[in-house]
Amino acid sequence: MSRYLITGGLGFIGAALGKSLAAAGHQVRIIDNLSGGHRDCATPDGELLVGDVADSQLVREAMAGVDGCFHLATSSELATQQDDDIGCNNLPGMINVLSSARDAGTRQPVPVVYASSSITYGDNAHTSLHEDLAARPLTSAAADKAAIEMRASVAALAHGIPTTGLRLFSVYGPAPHPQAHSSGVVASFLDSILAGRGITIFGDGHQTRDFVYLADAVKFFITAMAMPPAQPSIYNVCTGRQTSIRQLADMLCSLCGKAVQITRAPARRGDIRTSVGNPEQAIRHLGLRAGTALADGLAQMLAQHPAGHAFA
């Protein structure tokens, strides 16, 4: 049994990760500022420290005695990246995590697996985005993620901290708690359809995304922690399959057995046209790819939705 720290552990992915770790018999310690999470998302036997990763003393205390750190806390919602905040800055939290990981280990630094994002690729002409492509961030949130990756790389090379970054594509899945909410376009569309409201598509609807089921993303974090790298590593968390936003809307309407009005709005600044990942590096080194088919993941999400029981 191991003890793990999860920053942002009450959020969408963090809460699911904590539950999986606890189910496997591990001890879970969480830092969360409650800005996007709910207390009831914490694991029953876990330890919750309410605070922000920008608090260096809190992070240092939380890192003491842990066998690994999952860093998922963020100061900005990537789901609203178009509302670009020039002042958004996640680097202080990452620096606190890395410095504490360097100092907390008794024999060697604490391994860190952190959440990055496919938005670092920007609006790239490549139809299959691989990890060796240069970052082309279009928003401050994307630039933050790229900077965090560089900080992790330096920490690994200079201080021997095992760091693994996971570039998450479009993660979707059931909300971690009835009073919490999933983020992203899938949750937004599903909520609107079940409530009988219309759907708004920004742009022409032909923009594509690589949708990753939540349970698959969680498995990536756990597997990456079990395989601490000798060199700083980054992996796509993706299926390698693309689905257009209009196709997603049609799939959800069909799944729910409801027809709702679909309207178009102007494309948003910073919105990416095509985003589909190449899973080969993760397959080679982690033995993983996000394998849940979108239709299956949507059905599971609907079955667990508070308003979806009548349609499951």
Task: Tell what function each PLM region has.
Residues 2, 294-312:
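Amphipathic terminal alpha-helices
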Residues 69, 217, 221, 237, ...:
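Non-catalytic, hydrophobic alpha-helical segments
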Residues 146, 171-187, 197, 202, ...:
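Glycine/proline-rich active-site loop of Rossmann-fold NAD(P)-dependent oxidoreductases
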Residues 147, 151, 155, 185, ...:
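Hydrophobic alpha-helix immediately C-terminal to the catalytic Tyr-X-X-X-Lys motif of short-chain
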Residues 1-168:
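N-terminal Rossmann-like NAD(P)+-binding domain of SDR-like oxidoreductases, especially those catalyzing
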Residues 36-38, 245, 266-281:
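Active-site loop of classical SDR/Rossmann-like NAD(P)-dependent oxidoreductases
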Residues 54, 89-92, 139, 143, ...:
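Residue-level signal for the nucleotide or nucleotide-sugar donor/cofactor binding architecture
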Residues 244-256, 297-301:
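PAPS/PAP-binding and catalytic site of the sulfotransferase fold
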